[in-house]
């Protein structure tokens, strides 16, 4: 596709985002695309995003990738990914611009449902987003949710050995307990982050009130503390969040199950909160409905710096037998007290808007 770069929208640690216009269009036409660009020498994250978006292009709740190209600008070779333009902006901006910095419940329900549809499609196709948060949720012209920023996304893994190779990635305020304590970032981690997003939409505040990363990771990873459920939410909303904020990822509801929850489901799709017909007496590794949750046996008994997005934190120490540190506390200690150089704490939230 032959295109020209327009006005810069903003820039972050990965590079910059600008409007893009096809050469065949008049410059007076409203832009229908944006271009995400980074130096060709450090474009692996952007390339990963393009590959994954190509596989997820059939979902209306996921930002559409139009194409990619290389350009030479100001003596530098750039890698560019062309994306559809979400004219409604980021959901985080909508929240900030609302009257009391929170959304009415009918909008929370609408956006939660759209987000769930996108997450379900991502998971069904074998991927984990790894960085679900308000700034990465865009709104189209029709106010429809568009999940964006797949730079940290990865294939969902199926073996223990693969999980041991997982880096700590994402945004601390949205990280799941299993991500912090064991380095597991599979589909349940996206559901935990979804709960954080819903709580934030309902209150205007992050799910965790903590500005210190070390303290935040300790709170998420150790003990029984959970994010606070907003009092102003309906009983359906509170129950929805309780299904997202389950410490054990095996017992956390899946996107498919949550789509049938009364908080987001249409009347014909709703499963009653009091319906116990689907409970199972015996363990099952694959829940067949939202209420099929046996008692699995498990071995696991504010806004400032904590909002930074981490692409690669220090990996947990692997012992000769391939196991993690001997306890979650040791792993968290390694993360917060034995950091590698700051250059390895790559942040995606260094975004600066210029318009």
Tell where the protein language model's regions lie, with residue ranges.
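Glycine-rich ATP phosphate-binding loop
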Residues: 16-40
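Short beta-strand micro-motifs within the conserved protein kinase catalytic domain, predominantly
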Residues: 64-79
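Structural motif in protein kinase domains
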Residues: 86-96
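Activation segment signature within eukaryotic-like protein kinase domains
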Residues: 111-112
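Catalytic-loop of the protein kinase fold
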Residues: 123-140
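Activation segment
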Residues: 152-154
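Terminal C-lobe "cap" of eukaryotic-type protein kinase domains
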Residues: 246-251, 255-270
């Amino acid at each position: 596709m032959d295109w020209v770069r327009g006005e810069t929208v903003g820039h972050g640690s990965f590079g910059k985002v600008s409007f893009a216009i096809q050469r065949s269009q008049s410059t007076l036409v409203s832009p229908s695309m944006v271009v995400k660009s980074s130096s060709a020498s450090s474009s692996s994250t952007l390339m990963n995003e393009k590959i994954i978006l190509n596989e997820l292009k059939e979902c209306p709740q996921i930002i559409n990738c139009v194409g990619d190209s290389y350009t030479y600008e100001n003596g530098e070779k750039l890698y560019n990914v062309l994306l559809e333009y979400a004219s409604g902006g980021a959901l985080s901006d909508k929240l900030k611009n609302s009257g009391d910095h929170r959304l009415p419940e009918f909008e929370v329900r609408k956006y939660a449902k759209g987000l769930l549809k996108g997450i379900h499609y991502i998971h069904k196709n074998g991927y984990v987003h790894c960085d679900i948060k308000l700034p990465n949720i865009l709104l189209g012209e029709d106010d429809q949710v568009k999940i964006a920023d797949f730079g940290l996304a990865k294939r969902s893994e199926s073996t223990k050995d693969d999980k041991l190779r997982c880096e700590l990635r994402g945004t601390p305020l949205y990280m799941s307990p299993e991500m912090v304590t064991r380095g597991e970032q599979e589909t349940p981690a996206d559901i935990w982050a979804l709960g954080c997003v819903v709580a934030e939409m309902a209150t205007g505040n992050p799910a965790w009130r903590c500005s210190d990363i070390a303290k935040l990771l300790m709170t998420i990873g150790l003990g029984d503390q959970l994010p606070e459920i907003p009092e102003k939410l309906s009983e359906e909303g509170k129950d929805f969040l309780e299904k997202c904020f389950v410490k054990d990822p095996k017992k956390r509801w899946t996107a498919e199950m949550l789509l049938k929850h009364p908080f987001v489901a249409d009347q014909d799709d709703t499963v009653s909160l009091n319906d116990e017909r689907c409970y199972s007496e015996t363990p099952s590794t694959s829940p067949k409905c939202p209420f099929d949750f046996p008692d699995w046996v498990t071995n696991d008994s504010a806004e400032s710096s904590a909002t930074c997005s981490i692409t690669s934190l220090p990996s947990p120490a692997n012992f000769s037998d391939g196991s993690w540190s001997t306890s979650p506390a040791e792993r968290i200690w390694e993360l917060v007290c034995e950091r590698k150089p700051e250059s390895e704490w790559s942040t995606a939230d260094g975004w600066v808007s210029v318009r």
